[in-house]
Amino acid sequence: MNSFLQSLEDPARPFLGPNYWILKKMGLLLPKSILGKILYIFLHETVTFFVATQYMELYVIRSDLDLVLTNMKISMLSVVCIVKVNTFVLWQKHWREVLDYITEADNFERQNEDPVKSQIVEAYTKYCRRLTYFYWALVSTTFLTTTCSPLMRYLSSSTFRENMRNGTEPFPHIFSSWMPFDKYHSPGCWITVLWHTVLCAYGAAIMAAYDTCIVVTMVFFGGKLDLLRERCKHMFGSYGTVITDKQCEEVVRQLHGIHVMLIKYSRLFNSLLSPVMFFYMVMCSLMLCASAYQLTSAQNAAQKLLMAEYLIFGIAQLFVFCWHSNDVLIKNENMTSGPFESNWYTANYRQKKDVLLLSGQLRIKNIFTAGPFANLTLPTFINILKGAYSYYTLLRK
């Protein structure tokens, strides 16, 4: 396993290595060849069509609440998945700009020999590796529990097995979707199982690629803010050092340039992320509600365990986005104090004016949003959980 993880590292992209690898493998970053692009786009749109068949099935089963909730629990997450894929492919050019900026800015920081800055770079790199691999493991576990859910239901319930034998229970499937043939009897049932398993693996890999890319980008922006604050602390050198007005202007110009680029690309990143997060927030409350309702309605321990894992994944996915976005917001606010943590009081009048100008520039910040109505913060996370609980209580009544 260690050798495989090491093979994911990229010397040209020391920060984004594993994330860039999975983005390319899953076709979110399209290859240069025309044939490769066509094949990946065909794959993505095939899955988009499959999600449409889930909603076709939803119309067929609309009179059965339990079947509707089972369908919605998966189909809403499926919709979010294809929105992520299609927006990433559609806005390919802008995503590449963001990723190239991250690589360039990260390589610039790694060339610095200052021990404090090197420690910050090493800390956020290690954190992103651990977070990426943990999230991949969580997605893999969710994939296994989702695909094995019908099997566990069959093995854990003798009543269900007996009902299947006498024909009162249909063949259980991973997803609730329309098929153009009889999916409840052989060979159609096994073709459907294979089809669903492949699509579930695809969806899990897409989520692993997209979500970790989003989170490590947020972590990078937070790390960049820490580094900018550290630079501001030493803009006048060590205590007792005197710098000329020209040197001060050069330092302020460099800090200003770093901050302008940071704001530019964080806003570009937010413009790519915000529409997807808005759609995700709308779906998330309903998805969590359906999962919680089915968890409390499950008849045996095995089903409850599988439902609980799926619910935990949904909450963890939302929490990771809101937590790291909130962390960037806090670091934005802390970064503005950087110039006043320097030896500004030893500077002359002209240099102090430069400090004031810089501090005004650093007050400009970017907040990651979920559409025009909500910010990606911890209060938003709590409000979504409250909304999901409200829907849940309505269903229970």
What residue ranges belong to the model's regions?
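Hydrophobic alpha-helical membrane-embedded segments
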Residues: 74-94, 144-147, 204-220, 224, ...
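Helix-loop-helix junctions within predominantly alpha-helical proteins
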Residues: 2-23, 29-30, 34-71, 104-217, ...
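Short, Φ-rich (hydrophobic/aromatic) sequence segments
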Residues: 55-59, 98, 225, 358
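Membrane-spanning helices that line or support transport/gating and their immediate boundary helices
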Residues: 94-101, 216-220, 224-231, 327, ...
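Terminal membrane-anchoring module of integral membrane proteins
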Residues: 2-32, 36, 118-120, 133-142, ...
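Charged, amphipathic alpha-helical oligomerization/scaffolding segments
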Residues: 47-48, 71-74, 78, 94, ...
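Cytoplasmic, membrane-proximal interface of class
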Residues: 57-62, 86-93, 262
